[in-house]
């Protein structure tokens, strides 16, 4: 919460992301601090990263599947008063049933683009169809001809 309070004089900060692994107590404190400090500041809870697969989640000690963990994290975001969550497109359908706030989706790839190091990717149109309210795009836009890639994105969305 001290970090949030330190942002009070900085203009044009709309979102702060916080990982769900921070735990309920920390998440609630951050949400409370954001409300006191800046009424426009929106807290987005980050769920399981798109670079993590079910096999790698087990290797780091989790016994539940990614789908189960993300559902728990969506309930946590709701219970703690978060404005939104960040989740992979592959998790959108189950999350949308639980969480009604903003849902930001990373790991977006245009048709034909490599997933690279990302394990759980989805196309932009499918992400919006499945409940995403905003996309995070990097490689599909900046690799190669940016102008051409933006045109590809627009075509995919139409």
What are these regions (language model features)?
Residues 1-84, 88-92, 100, 110-113:
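Conserved anion-binding
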Residues 46, 105-107, 137-138:
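Generic beta-sheet signal
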Residues 82, 101, 131-135:
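A short pocket-lining beta-strand/turn micro-motif at the edge of beta-sheets
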Residues 93-98, 122, 158:
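N-terminal amphipathic alpha-helix/helix-capping segment at the start of soluble metabolic enzymes
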Residues 100-103, 118:
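Active-site regions of enzymes building and remodeling cell-envelope glycoconjugates
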